[in-house]
């Protein structure tokens, strides 16, 4: 079984990763989903984490970009009605999370055989 850490670069996934390494837990791969709209500092942080832990973080990307889904994607809305683009993501319309993070992750994990996925989530 493969042990895969889902790394967002945020405080919770960074802390989880470092704690797992400190405890000597098995980690076969570390994955990061790049939305294409990350702050430049996020890439710097990822590079620093890679250097600190001495391991490569695998970057996953969706097949289509944020800009495509935001403005170009054609979606149907019932009987013959169509609209173009999802527009700004909102709390109740989280297309960005689903299309740019969850779906690429699911697709990748499906190709890995048996796995355990680790996700850092704050307890509060």
Per-range role (PLM):
Residues 1-124:
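ATP-dependent adenylation/nucleotidyltransferase module used to activate substrates
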